[in-house]
Amino acid sequence: MSILNNKEVIVIIDAWSGGKHLIPAFQALGYFCLHVQSTFLPEVFIADNQLAIARSDRHIVHDGNIETLLSQLQPYTIKAILAGSEGAVGLADCLNDALELTFSNQFELSAARRNKYLMQEQLALKGVASINQQLAGHSDELKQWLAGHAHWPVVLKPIQSAGTDGVFICHDLAQALQAFEAILAKKDFFGSPNREVLCQEFLAGEEFVVNGIACQGEYFFTELWQSKKQQRNGFPVYETQYLHYQNDAGFDVLTAYTVQVCQTLGINNGAFHAEVMMTSGGPVLIEIGARVAGGADPYIIEECLGHSQISKLAQAVLHPAKFLQECRRQHDFSGHRRAAYVYMISPSPGRVQVSPEEKFIKIDGVISINYHYAPGDIQQETCDLLSSPGVIIAIRDNPALLKQTIAEIRDVEADFYHLGLIDE
């Protein structure tokens, strides 16, 4: 028996990482979901892409020809086109512009939302706090900027990438030149060659992730995360992220600044995921993505705050009037539950003897473990976010209990590295 309908369609491009939750979220509300796979599929997202193929009502593999893709979309009445991960942002902008969809961002600023150099230049142009930087395609350009900048450390990274891929913190000229050559010698996370390197001042302070949803130029902040990192061999490595919200210190300053950033970069509709450093002089953007947060589990925020980036994005797309009404309403989140992402940090490579999940899940407050290896695999040394062997998520009723849970997680992790791995 066949079923015919004229339902509006939600198009999701690269429903990977945090975006993998978008297809079931819209389908649960009765919407037909069409998934577009862009031209490059990073190896780390192969499993997520297979999940998107299985879940979606139709799957299209984009061959790089926009006109062909538009013709494939032509039979559908499209409600919205959404980027499911960072590499999809540019394609989503192109399709939204071609189809003149209203739930979209300012097309003229599309490049500034993806290119980290142009992003900071646009902020500086509009007088919004930004990073001192230089684009270098040759080592002489790097040396010239470093001589003029005259402050250490500095940050070198690709112009377009994801996570902490290819991000170096350099403390002297030798380290900077080595990082420069290392970045140029490899492709970025999305398979494009690095032909120039972004050189930036190092921001000292407390780092925050600021997540939210835009709708018709108004903004709802779903959650903030305070990020604790450590440096390993010149690389920034995530250690722990702590949930913050409206009643926590710094919320108003961080969100007011992020509104400025979104407005300056033309983020008027859809999800955004910003990394902001709270410096002694105030908040400064590290970078922002016009998409849902990568790797995020909406359960955590729903459990602690009663909403998530996924649920609020669906509301903004489907019921904008209700979304805007809730943006303007005062909410009391005092006493909200506390949560943390605890990232495993592997000190050295080793062959996995036994997986650690069962020991982690027994700790009070641990709700999930995402461990990336199986017995017999070689667990890699952690040098960035993508090489962390796993993440443990914890929820407790107050900060003291959460601190206790995190300490127990680190104890179990240390035992695992000592007893569960064989040196390679």
Swiss-Prot record:
Cofactor: record remark: Binds 1 magnesium or manganese ion per subunit.
Gene Ontology MF, one: metal ion binding
Binding site for ATP: 147-209
Pathway annotation: Antibiotic biosynthesis
Keyword terms, alphabetized: Antibiotic biosynthesis, ATP-binding, Ligase, Magnesium, Manganese, Metal-binding, Nucleotide-binding
Reaction catalysed by this enzyme: 3-[[[(2R,3R)-3-carboxyoxiran-2-yl]carbonyl]amino]-L-alanine + L-valine + ATP = dapdiamide E + ADP + phosphate + H(+); N(3)-fumaramoyl-(S)-2,3-diaminopropanoate + L-valine + ATP = dapdiamide A + ADP + phosphate + H(+); N(3)-fumaramoyl-(S)-2,3-diaminopropanoate + L-isoleucine + ATP = dapdiamide B + ADP + phosphate + H(+); N(3)-fumaramoyl-(S)-2,3-diaminopropanoate + L-leucine + ATP = dapdiamide C + ADP + phosphate + H(+)
Domain ATP-grasp: 120-318
Ligand binding (Mg(2+)): E275, E287
Record has ATP-binding as a keyword: yes
Disulfide pattern: none
GO BP annotations, alphabetical order: antibiotic biosynthetic process
Family annotation (InterPro entries): ATP-dep_AA_Ligase (IPR052032), ATP-grasp (IPR011761), Dapdiamide_Synthase (IPR053699)
EC number of the protein: 6.3.2.47
One of the Pfam families matching this protein, by short name: ATP-grasp_4
Cofactor(s) of this protein: Mg(2+); Mn(2+)
PANTHER family: ATP-GRASP ENZYME FSQD, FUMIPYRROLE BIOSYNTHESIS PROTEIN C
NCBIfam families: dap_A_syn_DdaF (NF041595), PRK07206.1 (NF005543)
Cited function: Involved in dapdiamide antibiotics biosynthesis. Ligates N-beta-fumaramoyl-DAP and valine, isoleucine or leucine to form dapdiamides A, B or C, respectively. Also ligates N-beta-epoxysuccinamoyl-DAP and valine to form dapdiamide E.
Protein name: Dapdiamide A synthase
The organism of origin for this protein: Enterobacter agglomerans
